[in-house]
Amino acid sequence: IYSSRSVIATYIGSGFQLFVGGTVIVWMPSYLNRYYGMNTDTAGVLAAVIVLCSAVGSILCGMLSDRFGQNCPDRKVSLAISYCIGSCLFLSIAFAMPAGKSQLLLICMGMFIALGTNGPSSAMVANLTHNSVHSTAFATLTLANNLLGLALGPLIIGKLSDVIGLHHAFQLMPLVSIIAAAVFLYAKNHYHQDIARLTDQAVLPNLESPVDVMRKKNDDA
């Protein structure tokens, strides 16, 4: 697992992208309370709608990845890169705008594709690892998502918001998606090489050595 550059890059890229999605999910109720003057109940409901958008988007982006990656698996990597750049664009524009309906709409659109990398990342790990280690591979992906994304994101943005304010911290947050896109691009550059190596590793154990062939002939004789 850990000798494949594409797999390691997928872990890191997926984690960094969840840095963005996880941060918005955690801090959005507080953001709505501070900058929209919403009470806790209303902010919680609206934040839940945004989370729902990200959940639906994750499924639809995964379906799109399956559709376009059927005959060309590395297209899934390209889609993951597109999701990173798209979410960065939408969220950057959203948090550059003043509070209002337009901003909320753009946040929903950004979150719709922000978690869209979940599907392609899982598919890439499945394609690049042997069946015998799939459980370990997916557990490591989950660890990377939690460590680099869902845990680290809210922590860093929270610390940053104490210094420059939550709104300004949110303005910087989407830039992490650019890092995620760059890491996925690195994975794409090594994807075919790692696939070929995995195929060789699967075929070679099934090949009989000349010594085994001679031994069988002697046994038959």
What role is predicted for each listed range?
Residues 58, 126-164:
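A late C-terminal transmembrane helix in Major Facilitator Superfamily
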Residues 11, 44, 48, 81, ...:
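Conserved glycine-rich helix-kink/hinge and helix-boundary motifs of the Major Facilitator Superfamily
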Residues 32-33, 64-65, 69, 156-165:
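Interfacial helix-cap and linker-helix signal at transmembrane-aqueous boundaries
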Residues 93-97, 171-205:
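Multi-pass alpha-helical transporter architecture, strongest
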Residues 67-83:
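Cytoplasmic membrane-interface "Motif A"-like loop-to-helix N-cap segments
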Residues 101-116:
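Hydrophobic core of transmembrane alpha-helices in multi-pass small-molecule transporters
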Residues 39-42, 75-78, 158-177:
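A membrane-interface helix-boundary motif in multi-pass transporters
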Residues 4-61, 114-122, 149-154:
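Extracytoplasmic gate region of multi-pass secondary transporters
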